[in-house]
Design a protein with these regions (language model features):
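Extracytoplasmic "Venus flytrap"/periplasmic binding protein-like
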Residues: 53-125, 160-162, 261-263, 270-271, ...
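Extracytoplasmic/periplasmic substrate-recognition and gating elements
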Residues: 56-57, 64, 79, 161, ...
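Hinge/lid segment of periplasmic solute-binding proteins
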Residues: 95-150, 176, 203-207, 291-293, ...
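C-terminal capping/gating helix-and-loop segments adjacent to ligand/active sites or protein-protein/ligand interfaces
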Residues: 307, 373-427
């Protein structure tokens, strides 16, 4: 019923905008722009509604939204278009780890180049979000589908284990204490789990208040080497993962995050960490009451926080300034409070414009869905610095896969945690070296 209610609000907004739209001119007189994206399913439906809403709200620009498949499919097609110097979309959605490629491609226009001429208020986007797409002080892309990791827990299991269902653990030591009570009480077979996922490794480094890569995570100059081996963060993270695994209250479900989610939703596991992107589905579909908490910390650190994931919108350099200005109008429209509220309510992603949370619809939604407020507050409580900006690297997809290959060997005792740090650092450093050579 909740889904129907909020979808009705979204559809109502579209219909109202259509009725209020001025008489349209012929399609031939409109500027027609192409928008490539990777949003399928419900997210794709909500996005198409926003595109239709924009098209109906004015009579100068027509956006043609084109689904490209997965993020990897999208970047592959974009690279092909760049190489052929034809067929570039006017606007392209790109996942977070594609940021360095886009920056280095020379085929994009920084969105900040449009701010002054259009009077756009840069502060309308929360800085903790825009910082991910900011290089040398300039914002290159507009954040769009934004998520972070957080703790999910089964409130029914907590009650059965004698734990306070309103008080989630805040550190991994507390996670272990609660996991022990869950298992020993028989409330659930497994106390805690987290998928083997390189993104979580990056997040836990940020929680420690340290960088993944040198040169301030690549924010002041290009990354030339990792930092996590020399700043001690990498060893602390690997030690923590191994401690969890060896406790007897943890189960490893591998690198496929959906497998860990399935174990949680079936009641086999009391707590997991996962992206806020699954929160809407988790709350709507779980057979038990879901609780949420901040991503646990290895150590409490004022410099620590979470890094955003997800994707952003980029302006491509098509050589047609009029089209580029029109494309910016579409991106600017997407960042408005009402549109961001609709996007967030319809998908579960964060609204990037803080004023979206002040709209009546969003206030009502958050009152009905308090778990979403946990996610929002965690993001707002994260400091804005190079740690939480995340690493700007052209090899992060490869780096995450390498972590995924190394972690099981730590679990099995084939590698010590120090060996794991050394191997991961050596592999990623080599990949960084090769990437930097390739773009000279």
């Amino acid at each position: 019923m909740k889904n129907k209610k909020w979808m009705a609000i979204l559809l109502g907004g579209i219909m109202a905008a259509s009725l209020a739209a001025p008489c349209s001119v012929s399609a031939a007189e409109k500027t027609t722009l192409t928008f490539w994206h990777a949003m399928g399913g419900t997210n794709g439906e909500v996005l198409q509604q926003i595109v239709d809403d924009f098209n109906a709200s004015q009579d100068e620009i027509e956006i043609k939204a084109e689904y490209q498949g997965t993020y990897d499919d999208t970047i592959t097609k974009l690279k092909a278009a760049m190489q052929s110097d034809s067929g570039l979309p006017d606007v392209c959605q790109m996942y977070d780890v594609g940021t360095k490629f886009m920056y280095d491609s020379g085929a994009v226009i920084p969105v900040e180049d449009k701010f002054e001429s259009t009077g756009y208020d840069k502060s309308s986007v929360m800085e903790v979000i825009s910082s991910y797409y900011t290089v040398d002080g300039k914002q290159y892309a507009m954040p769009f589908n934004v998520s972070t990791p957080m703790l999910y827990y089964n409130k029914d299991v907590f009650e059965a284990a004698g734990l306070d269902p309103e008080t989630p653990p805040t550190t991994y030591d507390e996670v272990l204490e609660d996991a022990k009570k869950i298992v020993e009480s028989g409330a659930a077979p497994v106390g805690y789990s987290q998928a083997i996922y390189g993104w979580f490794f990056e997040q836990q480094l940020a929680g420690l208040g340290v960088t993944y890569g040198n040169n301030d995570n690549g924010r002041t100059e290009a990354v030339t080497a990792v930092d996590f081996d020399s700043n001690g963060g990498g060893l602390k993270v690997f030690d923590m993962w191994k401690k969890l695994y060896d406790s007897g209250y943890f189960e490893d479900y591998g690198t496929t995050t959906a497998d860990t989610q399935t174990a949680f939703f079936s009641g086999q596991v009391g707590m997991i960490i996962e992206s806020t992107a699954i929160l809407k589905n988790a709350v709507d579909s779980s057979p038990f009451e879901v609780g949420t908490g901040y991503l646990p910390r290895i150590e409490q650190n004022d410099e620590g926080g979470v890094i955003i994931g997800g994707g952003s919108l980029w302006l491509t350099d098509t050589g047609n300034e009029a089209n580029e200005d029109a494309a910016w109008k579409f991106i600017e429209y997407i960042t408005t409070p009402d549109v961001q509220a609709k996007w967030s309510m319809g998908t579960g992603y964060f609204a990037i414009n803080e004023k979206a949370y002040e709209t009546d619809d969003m206030k009502a939604y958050l009152e009905e869905n308090p778990n979403f407020e946990t996610a929002i507050n965690q993001l707002k409580d994260s400091p804005v610095n190079c740690n939480t900006a995340g690493v700007l690297s052209g090899v992060q997809t490869e780096a995450r896969l390498t972590f995924n290959e190394i972690m099981p060997q730590v679990y099995d005792g084939k590698l010590t945690t120090q060996d794991a740090v050394d191997q991961l650092a050596a592999s990623v450093n080599k990949a960084i070296e090769n990437y930097n050579e390739s773009i000279k």
